[in-house]
Amino acid sequence: TIDSLMAIFNEGEYADKVVARALKKDKRWGSHDRKFVAETIYEIVRWKRLYVEIAEVKEPFDRDKIWRIFAVWAVLRGYNLPDWKYFEETPVRRIKGKFDELTKTRKFKESIPDWMDELGVKELGEEIWTKELAAQNDQAKVILRVNKLKTTKEKLRALLMDLNIETEFHNDYPDALILTERANVFLTDAFKEGFFEVQDASSQLVAYFLDVKPGMRVVDTC
């Protein structure tokens, strides 16, 4: 994890590529270990601004500085630090105190650079920007778009239930099934057979908005 964070922060490598490489390192890791490693790296990257401020370190980050950032993450997540030399002088109470102090300020609380906070306020105003920014830090739900050419929402829901993947309907999104808990749906036969795709709910409404008719040619660009 430390090597991965150094590659991302110091070398500018893409987090997803670094995580994929890290997960290949030890074939003995089970799904729980792999999930822990991936989520730890992504969390520390996402909350870098806040954690760096609490750890009182500056770029470029050597190994000791990365360990300090990692210690901040561990303390704030409620983990008991092991008896390693890297954690010998970790100021647990100070870390918690700095967290309470810094999270009174929006740019630290949401862990974004000054320029982004200033731009958001300028474009949207204080109230809307604060609300929108907080929403960006909520983990998005996994939402499926049912392929009604091949199945129905009810049939797909039952198929997934047999795999212990629970979903729910939403009145505003006629083609959507929303997972109640995150799961790797790409491994299912239903996905391989084209019964659904993963797509956020708002994007699913675009097809209805366009009111496409048979015989029309549609260009889907991004």
Where are these regions (language model features)?
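Glycine-centered loop/turn positions within well-structured domains
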Residues: V142, Q204, M216
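Class I SAM-dependent methyltransferase Rossmann-like catalytic core
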Residues: R106, D189-E197
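Glycine-rich helix-loop-beta junction characteristic of Rossmann-like nucleotide cofactor-binding loops
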Residues: T188-D189, Y208-P214
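Class I Rossmann-like S-adenosyl-L-methionine
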Residues: T1-L187
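Conserved class I S-adenosyl-L-methionine
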Residues: G215-C222
